[in-house]
Amino acid sequence: MCIRDRNYRPSLWKSIGGLKKAQEVNREIAKYVDVMIGNEEDFTASLGFEVKGADHNLSMIETDAFKAMIETAVKAYPNFKVAATTLRRVITATKNDWSAILWHDGKFFESRKYPELEILDRVGGGDSFASGLQFGFLEFNDAQKAVEYGAAHGALASTTPGDTSMATCKEVEKTFGGGSARVQR
């Protein structure tokens, strides 16, 4: 099983060919990926897919645009068994709407929505989403649970400092079950 969390960083590609080289390399790698994770920028910059109607200021979430992008990606790469992304609408630097979607076996699964999530530190939210998603699949082999674990874990990580989540499984389950997305200490 090959899992790829697409994080495109222009500064890392600048001296070795820029965007064109990044797309060339990432398109080759994508042929071997089973689970592709990434946001709109990651899919567009790394693989060259366009998200029609996407708001590059992240002031609104266009779920249908992300679904169309993922459908395009899985057609181009039929080896993808799962494609997933977080959905973030930036309200302020410290307040975001947060959720996630996942494609698996031709169907979409959406997480609970976390409106006006209080952000302490955005760093690590995507990685925590990816780890929660993997846990949900490994533990339950259930796409809906996977996207819920991922979104809740990412939300919790965003409410704490640093890029390493200290949330427990119980806290993640409480969060996607309707509890607050704040780590209780």
Predicted regions span which residues?
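Conserved small/polar residues in nucleotide/adenosyl-binding loops
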Residues: 1-3
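A short beta-strand/loop micro-motif in the catalytic core of glycosyltransferases
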Residues: 33-39
